[in-house]
Amino acid sequence: MIYNMKIVIVGDGKVGYTLTKSLSEEGHDLVVIDNNRRILLASQESLDVAVVDGNGASVEVQREAGVDTADLLIAATNGDETNLLCCMVAKKLGCKHTIARVRNPEYDQQIRFMREELGLSMVINPEKAAALEIFRLLQFPSFLKRDSFARGNAEHVELKLKDGNPLIGKPLQQFRTVADVNALVCAVE
């Protein structure tokens, strides 16, 4: 059984709306906060979400949104400082987890401090994350799929061996010797 979370999303712009749409499709209980009533009403009509019109950094607005009983608050406004303040307020109100969108590279050196001192569960810089993902994919262009897990300590990769590859026809016991890698083969098609 999948656990449906109560999630509050602050900011109904491109990032916030995309998150709201995806999480709504997964069946989570969502409340969206934004100070643009027109955009909020459009989201409310097109998605299965509750909305609160107001400043997401406001204690009263967050209370109205039910942050005190939320599993997660995601602050995805265009303002880094607003996002950080939203998360601080949510944590003080009793929200279990908070995620802040922080785009300014000046804050990169302070992320650990922000997580520890401000009680943030995660800080995300979308542009930096996209650049790192592109770099990661370009490192091994032959991989059809590449996913990290265990906090980046392990990876699952999918690749198709081309004709003439020295691994073709070899027993799996010889994989590490022939490929000269420390890997565990999970499946062969």
Segments the model singles out, each with a brief description of its role:
Residues 1-189:
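Cytosolic regulatory regions of ion transport systems
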